[in-house]
Amino acid sequence: MYSNLPVIPIVIPLLFASITIFFKNNTFIQKQITLCASILVTISAIFNIFKIKKHEILILEMGDWKSPFGITLALDGLNSILVLTSAIVFLATIIYSSKTIDKYSENSFFYTGILLIMTGINGAFTTGDIFNLFVFYEILLMASYLLLLVGIKKEQLKSSISYVLMNVFAGSLFVISVGYLYTIVGSLNMAYISKTISSLPDKRGLYLVGLVMIFVFAMKGAIFPLFTWMNRAYAAPPIAVSIIFAALLTKVGLYSIIRTYSLFYYESNTIKYFLLSLGTISIIVGCIGAIYQKNLKQIVIFNIIISLGIMVAATSVLNSKAIKGVILYSINDILLKAALFTMVGIIIYICKVKNIKKCGLINKYPLLGWTFFITTLCLSGVPPLSGFYGKALIIQGFVEDKQIFVGVIVTLSGLIVFYSLIKVFLNIFYDNTNKSLELKPLPKILIIPVLSLLVIAIVVGLCSNLLEPLLEKSTSTILNSNKYIELVLQKG
């Protein structure tokens, strides 16, 4: 279906970001503008979901330039789900930041950066051509550089160097691979590329480009062995920034892998086993890091690596159960990782500790403690909570593809996730032997985003049968590239 709806989640934050610049010295107005933009994007994303349930895919050809020559925005089940989930996380983050970001950081274009990174993320999810995927990557990266330096502490400056260098290198490789792809196909429209390459007699050059692209997306998604930059970059900035980085930025890399692999490289066993290997090793490395880490932020970061590894490995097998599982698992993971990082921020705010210490918070803050415990169960994949259903489908997908070893690794990773987070729970919340620790009072507004994210994640898991029609459409569009090609090139 032809529609202007796909551009709305991109235009709203971009427009509101430009408005915040005129109120540089009034952070209260900036905050209200950002909150308003986030609410509007959430509403538009919900509306888009209902439209896609009817029409399967929404197409917008910018300037009425026809595919494959013009800029195309294509919103289907997968990216509409990601746009909505991202909007919810942004909304929760803005509420959380209202009490945790200091005035100096707020005056450093914090809210402008939030809106620009929202623009880049939504654009990367929605674009239908490979070059504008690069453009939106650059928008979100420029915004992330700004947010990474909010407050300008020494630790942030150090972490920003590796982050910027990594992205400059990845961006250069991406441009080179896009240019080479254009010389082969003669277009940058994803649907047209997919249609054209299926008839190419010699695909070796194409698969080489594919490996480079997967390498770039793996670097941006922090997949093994390209995740080392993440430990500093995600831990250094204020928690409000880390929430967005941890929950969303890596998912843009994952989405790019899913989209390009399913459209361009699904016939290549080389790329399949390359992805499967990267994903499996990422799970193992993430598990090792999560076990041995004592720093609260680093424990969450290594848990992110585990979940990314699971989703990348599942994407490689490209069957119905695995892809459906990845979509459901990604919704759960985005919401719960955001909730987990928010709770880590609250713990640091209350106790002024960065490592696991005996704080005994359960007596004074029981709601926070039990929310952390339930989040731990969800992320571990304990049935019937939200993390179970997506992971169960992923394991079934591995079994169907005869990747039993990987399925076992994914199953065992749930135990490691549980262990890594329960040690935080037992020490931070239950052990109260440290009597000398002074606890700051907790502003009640900080618990609202945590509870909201957790409740939404649990509802999504328990009511996943209600999402079945949308999940089926999303999976069908990914697995049946001909359907996506037909809908995009014929304008729905």
Each language-model region and where it sits:
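Cytoplasmic juxtamembrane regions at transmembrane-helix boundaries
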Residues: 98-113, 247, 437-446
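Hydrophobic alpha-helical membrane-insertion segments
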Residues: 35-49, 168-176, 452-466
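Transmembrane helix-loop-helix hairpins at membrane boundaries of multipass inner-membrane proteins
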Residues: 1-7, 15, 19-112, 191-195, ...
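Short phosphate-coordinating micro-motif centered on Lys-Gly-acidic
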Residues: 138
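Hydrophobic transmembrane alpha-helices and their helix-loop junctions in integral membrane proteins
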Residues: 92-102, 108, 118-133, 144-392, ...
